[in-house]
Amino acid sequence: FATVDYRGEPITESTSFSSFCRMARNDGQLSLRCKSSDAFGSIQAAVMQKPSVYFCPCGLLEVAIPIVVRGHYLGGFIGGQVRCSDAPEDTSRLEKVMAPAAIEGIIEKNKDLLEQLPEYSFEKFMDIVNLIFLIINQLGENEMHLQMRWEKQQKQVKKLYSLNQKLAEESAQKDLKILDLEASR
């Protein structure tokens, strides 16, 4: 998993990548394709403001889930990297457009790592995607509400502090007047 900005650049540490994906992201030829794939998914998800499901250049099913709070795109969550043989034909397949011949040898050499990846039906994958989308965006909304409430409380604290200062000054002035009155007797 990785959280990325709209360009596909990671903004958090990537976690739980498979051995195959770690190899690919550390390979000079493949890493740029992985980042481009992340960017493709992120842009699609940002524009549609819903999950974008696609096949990465290595032929693995991935998803970019937009993080949208109050209509504002904040970034994306990239995940998946699973094998899937029953995806609809209209699912974007980046392996067809990102110089597949240049990476075929690398993929073939690491076929054992590729075969270790789990295989999901497209329906099961989409069930997981929809659940994660719901959770991520609910967390974003909750965080936004907490932030707004904190800001409101900070404004109230400032008002109370100002009022307290004003009352303290008024009290000090009244104390001085009382002292003046007592001194003039």
Feature map (PLM): residue ranges:
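Amphipathic alpha-helical coiled-coil "transmission" helices that mediate dimerization
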Residues: 134, 141-185
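Sensory/regulatory domains in signal-transduction proteins
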Residues: 37-96, 123-139, 146
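Short alpha-helical "patches" and their helix-cap loops
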Residues: 93-98, 102, 147-154
